[in-house]
């Protein structure tokens, strides 16, 4: 284990083998760190959190010469709240805010300028790109792709292998750079497995997108859309509305 002299480690913190803790890292009490974890400078890990093997925390992004959404700027430190669990082989970048009781599965990647609200679940192999906001009590399931500049409000559900997109120009023309915008999911929206959401689309509160759909236009609240391209199918059943769920705690 390597621990910088400027790091601040509270009581009852356990480390696996080959851990690296860089300058000015702060680790609160009762944190568990697995084997081969790298904690980059200035990172904060809140009380009772668990970091599994081979994970990198606080990574500074590299900018490709042709990247259109990665900024050259000084990012704030990675801040991990209390009782957060981060699985094995994850990469969490600098400039991320993870609130209390978040669960992040193995092999997930969370880019810079991302906020994740309390008690949200980020599944195995999920990618969350930069400049994205994820609310509270959200579930993002295995291998979903959340593109840059997206918004996911509280209580949303995103099934496995859903794809968000943000570039209608598919990498061509300079004009595209002023139009980058990911989807917006309003509170309680649900997206079925393997659905694709095109750039800038807004999915209304409590709306439902059926599995395999391609969403090319905004979806009103409390409506079910299905198909390629997705079209209105029916109203969301009353018993499925967020307000009627036992786990819903309101604002």
Features from the language model and the residues they span:
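Structural signal for interior beta-strand "rungs" in well-ordered beta-sheet cores
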Residues: 1-64, 68-226, 231-232
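A glycine/serine/threonine-rich, flexible loop-to-helix segment
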Residues: 222, 236-250
């Amino acid at each position: 284990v390597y621990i910088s002299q400027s790091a601040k480690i509270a009581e009852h913190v356990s480390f696996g083998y080959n851990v690296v803790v860089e300058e000015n890292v702060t680790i609160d009490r009762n944190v568990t760190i697995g084997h081969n974890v790298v904690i980059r400078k200035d990172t904060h890990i809140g009380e009772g959190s668990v970091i599994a093997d081979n994970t990198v925390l606080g990574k500074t992004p590299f900018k490709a010469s042709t990247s259109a959404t990665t900024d050259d700027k000084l990012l704030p430190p990675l801040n991990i709240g209390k009782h957060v669990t981060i699985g094995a082989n994850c990469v969490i970048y600098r400039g991320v805010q993870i609130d209390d009781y978040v669960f992040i599965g193995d092999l997930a990647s969370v880019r810079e300028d991302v906020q994740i609200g309390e008690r949200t679940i980020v599944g195995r192999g999920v990618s969350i790109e930069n400049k994205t906001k994820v609310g509270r009590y959200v579930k993002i399931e295995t291998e979903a792709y959340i593109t840059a500049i997206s918004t996911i409000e509280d209580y949303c559900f995103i099934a496995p292998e859903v794809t968000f997109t943000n570039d209608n120009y598919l990498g061509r023309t300079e004009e595209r750079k002023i139009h980058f915008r990911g989807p917006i999911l309003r509170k309680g929206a649900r997206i079925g497995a393997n659905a694709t959401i095109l750039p800038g689309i807004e999915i209304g509160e409590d709306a439902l997108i059926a599995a395999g759909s391609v969403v090319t236009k905004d979806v009103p609240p409390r409506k079910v859309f299905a198909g390629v391209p997705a079209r209105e199918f029916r109203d969301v059943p009353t018993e499925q509305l967020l307000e009627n769920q036992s786990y819903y705690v309101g604002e």
